[in-house]
């Protein structure tokens, strides 16, 4: 009988602890303020109920469809929205007019901002997506990727390791990019063979990226500028003969031509 009482007390104490933990974990509530969004979904505004990293108690946030859309001290600012089976979790935040929906997951301190969209089954893990960028399909971003402007990632593509997509860069298919890849204007990458890069070859540029466009020709991203291959060749030819750029980049040009079978 004593053992039964001890067991009962332990269970009761465990239940009380679980309820307390849940109460401590809860940091927002759904308000009665509702909207019907552009997708025809009825969403409810959230309100912060205790101070944490992104909001203070009583502060209103954005709109979500259900409590399961948000967790782990993640937050949605006033104009941002989450719906469907999508989840924004683990200290991530939506700002501006960002939208996350479908079965997408945004986690581990990611920031989705401006007019950015993450949807379908996409995963954004510890990354920054802004501008009018889109991440969709079954694609995923991880480990500090930055997307901006009108960049898109979709299909089964994966990008990681502080890579950066700018302007109208597009990555799709089964492309798998890492090692701080930088893609910019007119990039159209559907497989790994569509791009390559060179690191720390001269003081002017930490990264020189070469990639295909949708038309099939090449662009070179170097020192924050984008060149056609012809223009980049001229840049090398005009360089000071004493510069590291002049000494190193003719060899880089030869590698580019061999790599892309020119």
Regions from the PLM with identified roles:
Residues 9-12, 26, 161-162, 173, ...:
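Terminal low-complexity, poorly structured segments
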Residues 16-73, 79, 103, 132, ...:
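Terminal amphipathic alpha-helical/low-complexity segments used for targeting or macromolecular assembly
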């Amino acid at each position: 009988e004593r053992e039964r009482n001890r067991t009962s007390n332990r269970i009761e104490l465990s239940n009380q602890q679980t309820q307390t933990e849940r109460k401590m974990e809860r940091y927002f509530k759904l308000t009665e303020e509702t909207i019907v969004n552009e997708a025809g979904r009825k969403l409810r505004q959230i309100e912060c109920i205790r101070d944490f990293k992104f909001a203070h108690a009583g502060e209103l946030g954005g709109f979500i469809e259900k409590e399961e859309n948000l967790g782990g001290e993640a937050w949605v600012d006033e104009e941002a929205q989450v719906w469907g089976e999508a989840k924004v979790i683990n200290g991530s935040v939506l700002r501006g007019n960002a939208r996350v929906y479908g079965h997408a997951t945004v986690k581990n301190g990611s920031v989705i901002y401006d007019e950015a969209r993450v949807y379908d089954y996409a995963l954004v893990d510890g990354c920054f997506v802004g501008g009018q960028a889109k991440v969709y399909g079954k694609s995923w971003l991880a480990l500090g990727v930055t997307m901006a402007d009108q960049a898109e990632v979709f299909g089964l593509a994966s990008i990681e390791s502080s890579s950066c997509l700018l302007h109208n860069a597009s990555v799709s298919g089964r492309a798998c990019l890492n090692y701080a890849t930088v893609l910019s204007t007119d990039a159209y990458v559907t497989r790994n063979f569509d791009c390559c890069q060179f690191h720390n070859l001269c003081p002017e540029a930490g990264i020189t990226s070469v990639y295909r466009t949708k038309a099939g020709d090449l662009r070179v991203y170097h020192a924050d500028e984008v060149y056609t291959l012809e223009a980049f060749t001229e840049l090398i030819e005009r360089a000071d003969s004493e510069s590291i750029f002049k000494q190193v980049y003719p060899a880089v040009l030869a590698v580019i031509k061999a790599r892309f079978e020119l």
